[in-house]
Swiss-Prot record:
Top-level taxon: Viruses
Listed name of the protein: Uncoating factor OPG117
Functional summary from the UniProt entry: Multifunctional protein required for genome uncoating and replication. Major viral uncoating protein that is required for the release of the viral genome from incoming viral cores containing the viral DNA genome. Possesses an ATPase activity that is required for hexamerization and uncoating.
First-listed, main subcellular location of the protein, grouped into a coarse class: host cell
Segments forming domain SF3 helicase: 477-639
Catalytic residue list: D170
Entry keyword annotation includes 4Fe-4S: no
Gene giving rise to this polypeptide: OPG117
Localization (cell): Host cytoplasm
Record: residues binding ATP: G503, E504, T505, A506, T507, G508, K509, S510
Recorded family membership: Belongs to the orthopoxvirus OPG117 family.
Subunit structure: Homomultimer; hexamer. Interacts with OPG148.
């Protein structure tokens, strides 16, 4: 190497930031000066408030420099963290520089690492609120062009590193005519913080990147190609705004149309001249037209529009490309279709192969962290900051405008790891399950190894269920309704009727409830009796709100309606609870519409009593009777003499513990799916059993005895008048006393007196103050000859 290149002890400095180029080239003593190292040290000592910035005097003639870095972290690290971070920092940057030097400069990888790690100086900032330093690798030399070419490599390192010091490398210093503040000097006269020397290096030349003193331990490398030739294969960086948006901005600047606009792409836009159709004067300089075309270049994260030929004949225009990274991250996450807005204004997210919804947890933040490693490196590092994650989350919420309809797959049962098709038994996981958007699931993982018919658990479970609901001819209808009701709890659709589990104490009702809860877990909810006895849509009602999208709702332990003061079951509530949407809001919330997919089961020891009975109510009630009693040995004899029980079985004291430990979870789930295919494919069916409710007996029978009178009955009036009917206002009517006489032939007044009176009070009309009548005709009076 030439001796001139091997040494430089003249340090060229600028006396302030922003020295004009002319003053720099002319070496105006007001703005620039050159020092020997000892002279520079004396100058700083004599002028403690001076501002000096080291730079190359003439980069064209001499551009040998030491490898240097400027690190500026907006946080103060304690001593232990700092020592750990600086050690990792040296290893990371030396490896990075060595790889670049080997690839682009033909340097020996091990020699670069050895020279960098063996000798370097480190300054320390006096600013206690931040961690800032300059590091000079004293025996590692290169050219300024090489450092500029290395800028992209160091930028990628800083973006991908977990080390806070590496992430804080200022790559902007790697440019033409770069400057670096001299140790011991201020940034500006009003700034009292400086960089100070640290042992073992106490000579100022050890802190100057333009000082060159090569020796046997030094290592030098430089680019094998020109800097201009080091153009990346793809110019467009992920951090830029989209190429389409950038070119549209360029087009708007010209106003005149670009004829070859469609020929431009991310790889050729810097080499293809722009062909302008000058319908109007040039928008940049107002000239009528130009002889030479305009062209684009990519510099400093911006598109530069310039004219070829004489560049001074038209203005240069800069189009910045810095996109909002946090906005771009939000857009990329939205593009994965992993966050959706529901009709209720809630957000559901796709994490770990399942849709998750919980308004009390920051699920979008969890999604951002889980998807971080799938994003480009320059984005993933941004998400390590909690503040930036919150910004991304806010961007995602703001960008979600259109809501989607969820939970529209009634024959699909969601799990934490996928979706089970109830019809064909297929289990979908991963992207195959993603299309089945849902806000609720069972909350546990499906295990196909346990979802089998032949297992010890299944054998035990079948015996338990056969004890609760025996497979006998007498109990056949009851057992069928039992299976239909429980299997309907898998279906995510509105059910047409409510089911009462009716029986004395210790007959298996609670055991059935616990088995069902174990099998569908989070799709099951237990609620209070108020949904049956209180007004539903009056004030906050968390019981109703908790029913939203649940597939099974259990209401346990109704009161003894024979007791005075006990509220009866409201028939209006029964009707509302079989509607697709139930009104009721949680406390401190405005969400009142709850989608009703639940099979509502009421287990009770007492006969249900309703405030009002009509046909609409009777179409909505089914009853499953439980007549097997599970008794302890001491009470078995008494139970066997109780007419309320068909059978008496010994109580299994350990059964509850097994159910709570989910021993029968997958066995019972298998049975439910089997029953579902038996009864509810292709259509989910639940039929009422009003004949099982004693209070419905009168209304069921009277519907077969009476019809409402109408105009078509008037021609029959000759015969009807002989049977006590009269014509009033052109309508065939039956006087009240006559009706009471006729109805007594069918109903015992002692047993059904209250029902008869209620029917009369509801339907009677007044001819005058004393005469009352009903607009009904007994069917036998119009069917008999």
């Amino acid at each position: 190497m030439d001796a001139v290149i091997r040494g430089n002890d003249v340090i060229f400095v600028l006396k302030t930031i922003g020295v004009p180029s002319v003053c720099r080239q002319n070496e105006d003593p007001r703005f620039v000066e050159a020092f020997k190292c000892d002279e520079l040290e004396r100058y700083i000592k004599n002028n403690p408030e001076c501002t000096l910035f080291e730079s190359l005097r003439d980069e064209e003639a001499y551009s040998i420099v030491r490898i240097f870095m400027d690190v500026d972290l907006d946080a103060c690290l304690d001593e232990i963290d700092y020592l750990t971070a600086i050690q990792d920092f040296i290893i990371e940057v030396s490896n990075c520089v060595a790889r670049f030097a080997f690839t682009e400069c033909g340097a020996i990888h091990e020699n670069v690492i050895k020279s960098m790690r063996s000798n370097f100086s480190l300054t320390k900032s006096t600013n206690r609120d931040k961690t800032s330093f300059h590091i000079i690798f004293l025996d590692t030399y290169t050219t300024m062009d090489t450092l500029i070419a290395m800028k992209r490599t160091l930028l990628e390192l800083s973006r991908s590193s977990e080390n806070p010091l590496t992430r804080s490398i200022d790559t902007a210093v790697y440019r033409k005519k770069t400057t670096l503040r001299v140790v011991g000097t201020r940034k500006n006269p009003n700034c009292d913080t400086i960089h100070v020397m640290q042992p073992p290096h106490d000579n100022i030349e050890d802190y100057l990147f333009t000082y060159v003193d090569m020796n046997n331990n030094s290592y030098y490398f430089s680019l094998q190609r020109r800097l201009e030739d080091l153009v990346p294969d793809k110019l467009w960086e992920p951090g830029f705004i989209s190429f389409e948006d950038a070119i549209k901005r360029v087009s708007k600047i010209f106003i005149n149309s670009i004829i070859n606009f469609n020929d431009l792409d991310e790889n050729n836009f810097t080499t293809v001249p722009l062909v302008i159709d000058y319908v109007t004067p040039c928008a940049l300089c107002k000239k009528r037209s130009h002889k030479h075309p305009h062209q684009l270049s990519l510099e400093n994260d911006a598109i530069r529009i310039y004219k070829t030929g004489n560049p001074h004949s038209c203005k240069v225009k800069i189009v910045p490309l810095d996109g909002n990274k946090l906005f771009n991250i939000a857009q990329r996450i939205l593009d994965t279709n992993s966050v959706l807005l529901t009709e209720r204004g809630d957000h559901i997210v796709w994490i770990n192969n399942s849709w998750k919804f919980n308004s009390e947890e920051p699920l979008i933040t969890k999604l951002i962290l889980s998807i971080r490693h799938q994003l480009p490196k320059e984005y993933s590092s941004e998400l390590l900051c909690p503040r930036k994650r919150k910004t991304v989350e806010a961007n995602i919420r703001d960008m979600l405008v259109d809501s989607v309809e969820t939970d529209t797959y009634p024959d699909k049962l969601p799990f934490k790891n996928g979706v089970l098709d109830l019809v064909d038994g297929m289990f979908y996981s991963g992207d195959d399950a993603k299309k089945y958007t849902c806000t609720v699931s069972t909350g546990f993982k499906f295990d196909d190894t346990k979802f089998v018919e032949d297992s010890p658990e299944m054998e035990e479970l079948i015996n338990i269920i056969n004890d609760i609901q025996p497979l006998t001819d007498e109990n056949k209808k009851n057992r069928e309704l039992y299976e239909k009701t429980l299997s309907s709890c898998l279906c995510g659709a509105t059910k047409g009727c409510l089911t009462f589990f009716f029986g004395e104490t210790a007959t298996g009702k609670s055991t059935t409830k616990r088995l069902l809860k174990s099998a569908i877990s989070d799709l099951f909810v237990e609620t209070g009796q108020t949904i049956l006895t209180d007004v539903l849509d009056k004030g906050p009602n968390p019981f109703i709100a908790n029913m939203h999208l649940k597939r099974s709702v259990f209401c346990s332990e109704l009161p003894d309606f024979a007791c005075s003061g006990t509220k009866k079951i409201r028939s209006d509530n029964i009707k509302k609870l079989t509607e697709p949407c139930v009104i009721g809001r949680p406390c401190f919330s405005n969400k009142i519409n709850n989608r009703n997919h639940a099979t509502i089961i009421i287990d009770t020891n007492y006969k249900p009593v309703f405030d009002r009975i009509d046909n609409a109510l009777m179409r909505r009630i089914a009853v499953v009777r439980f007549r097997t009693h599970f008794s302890q040995p001491s009470g078995r004899e008494a139970a066997e003499n109780n007419d309320a029980y068909d059978k008496v079985k010994l109580l299994d004291e350990g059964l509850d513990g097994k159910i709570q430990n989910n021993r029968y979870r997958f066995a019972f789930l298998y049975l439910l799916v089997k029953w579902y295919r038996k009864y509810h494919v292709p259509i989910m069916k639940l039929y009422p059993t009003p004949e099982e409710i004693p209070d419905f007996a009168f209304y069921l029978k009277i519907g077969t005895l009476l019809v409402s009178s109408s105009v078509k009955h008037i021609p029959l009036m000759t015969d009807l008048s002989k049977k006590g009917y009269i014509l009033h206002d052109n309508v065939v009517t039956l006087p009240l006393t006559t009706f009471q006489q006729k109805i007594s032939k069918y109903f015992n007044s002692r047993l059904f007196g209250h029902d008869i009176e209620s029917f009369i009070n509801r339907h009677k009309k007044f001819a005058n103050v004393s005469d009352e009548y009903l607009q009904y005709i007994f069917i036998e009076d119009i069917s008999s000859p």
